[in-house]
Structures are given as structure tokens and as C-alpha cells.
């Protein structure tokens, strides 16, 4: 079967899928996302949303849409941070797009008591029409990829099959994909033999762009990946905060792959929407004032609290193996009439 089919079965099968049957987030799960590292992340995303709403002309009604909200931590912190803007809170209706019953239940627990209407949806297309501010943190990396490998007679699809011993293995389709070179960026066409190229279906990004064009507004997408299309296998599996073989324990471990921000931007712009970035996550959070927010939180805290805030700050904006600041990137999408979204000025 294609790699994309394998990923979709492992992650989203209604009875056995990884995301549909469990809560994988947090210290007790398999991985930790930026909102789980510190409240500062969600608070700053909330301020970005409020500033974007003002830039939109402060409409009386606005849909606040999150794709793949996890446990609801980011949205909870974001809405708490914008309590100082009652007009924005009064205008907002929150729409959470998530197919996982387990995570929806967790989101309900996290967000209960907030004085904001909240609705759940299976897809972005299900969200009612109107001006929207869309946020997606570590959403696109979990969308299924296809893989091809270059050989002397062209590009061949990489697939997954069952070996004689019953184990899953990668295989290569015998026939090359006809005229596949014509679809690739120049730097990919020039790749060496045995190079692996990955790509995703562009329909989820196109849905975001269409929504912005139809109803007005903006979107903020944060994920890990590379700025330009490139070769190299990035499919990875994570379980219990450690890397694993993606072909073992299907449905029991997380499968992701790097986001190709060049391809993502092209898909978004194909709808007429305008994109900004990508910029590093560290740059986004610095421009939104994370260092000032950290200092404020530390001002009245204990030594232990200050140390924890410093550690979280280093994780969110630091570089290298322990930091998320350079691997994670942000891209903004807006209606052409909106202008440059907050934090994305050159």
C-alpha cells in the first residue's frame, strides 16, 4: 500500500487509529507540543488572534478556528490571555476541528467554564461561514505523506508491504511514475539516484486558503519542517517520548513527517490568499513579546518557578537538539486586503 494509506490507517482508523483512540499528549503520553511546554505559548497566540481581529476591523462576530487542538491547552491559554479585551471575547465563537473522540472529550474538560461559545467539527468545511481567524499548531505534520525514490529510469513510488515473515517492510514499485519530473521543483528533479522525495495532498491547505478568501480573516500555521522543498526521508515515529520504527506497532505510535513550507505556501496561494513567512518559531515568539512575558511571570515567583520559566523559554525559542526555536517555523495567511498580519513585518 502507499505510505499515505498506511499513515492514514495508523493514525485515523475509527477503531484502531492512534489519534482516534487515545490522548497522546503531555508527560504521560508520547510527545509534548509547545502549548504543553508553557502557558506563554498559548497566551501569545491569543494576543496574535486579538491583534489580527483588530486589523480585520474588529468585526462583531468572528470564528476562532483551531485545527487539531490537542488537549485544548493552547486555546485555553489564548482565551484566558485575551480577557483584557472583552470586545474580542464577546465577538468570538470558538470552532475546534478534530476527528478524535478521545481528544474532543479532553478538550471539553480543559475548556469547560470559559464564557465563550465552543463548537466541534469534523472538518474545516463544516465550520459556519463568516470572518475567521484560524490557528494550526503541529497539525500539518500529522497529515499523510507520499514517498517516491529516484532510480535511473525515473521516480518510483515507495510502498509498504508484508514480508514472508509477516513483518512490514518498505518496497518500491517496479514501474516509474510517468512524467513525474514535470511536477517537481528544479532542485528535486536534479536529485541523485536513491534520493527520497515526500509530498502531501494539497487539499487541507487549499481549504484554509479558500476559507480566508471566502469569509475574510487570517491563519497562523506553526509546525516543524523545511523552508524549501528538498529530498530526504523525514517520516518518523514517536512513542513514550522516544523515536521508534514507523513500521512497528501500527496504531500504537505517532507518525509524522516534516512540513514542506514551500509547497504549503504554494497551495495556500493557489486560492488567491497571500502568505507571509515562514519565520522561525523563535522569531515569532520574540516579536510577540515572549521574553517580556517571561520576565513578568518571574517577577513574583519563587526561585523554582523562575527556573522552570527559564527552562520553558529556552525550549520554545532555543536552537539545537533541546530547542524548538529553529526547527519549528510559522507561516501566516491572509486575505489580500488585510495587510501583513501581526509579527510578520519584514
Q: Where do the PLM segments sit?
A:
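Rossmann-like AdoMet
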Residues: 1-67, 71-131, 283, 289-292, ...
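Short glycine-enriched loops at secondary-structure junctions
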Residues: 11-16, 176, 223-227
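Alpha/beta-hydrolase-fold catalytic nucleophile elbow
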Residues: 97, 137, 222
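Short, glycine/acidic-enriched loop or turn micro-motifs at the edges of active sites
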Residues: 101, 140, 226
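A mobile, often basic/glycine-rich helix-loop segment
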Residues: 133-185, 232-245
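Long, Lys/Arg- and hydrophobic-enriched amphipathic alpha-helices
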Residues: 179-346
